[in-house]
């Protein structure tokens, strides 16, 4: 698909051309504007995808943390009840 862009700031075009030359030197071949712009589109959408994945990961970590806190509280309740039960059983054996 072709996209034609109008009214681009000449400064931005110079910067794109400059970066294309730098990349071209590293690659050992001419690097075209269209390649650079395609790369920029790709990076933009990959960043959006990554950001979305990070948000979902952060939400999952938060949910796991909440679940672990609840489980920890329940486990502590169980331990406390067990200690009370053992203490009561020891007291009964002593009588």
Swiss-Prot record:
Keywords: Plasmid. This is Uncharacterized protein pXO2-04/BXB0002/GBAA_pXO2_0002. It comes from Bacillus anthracis.
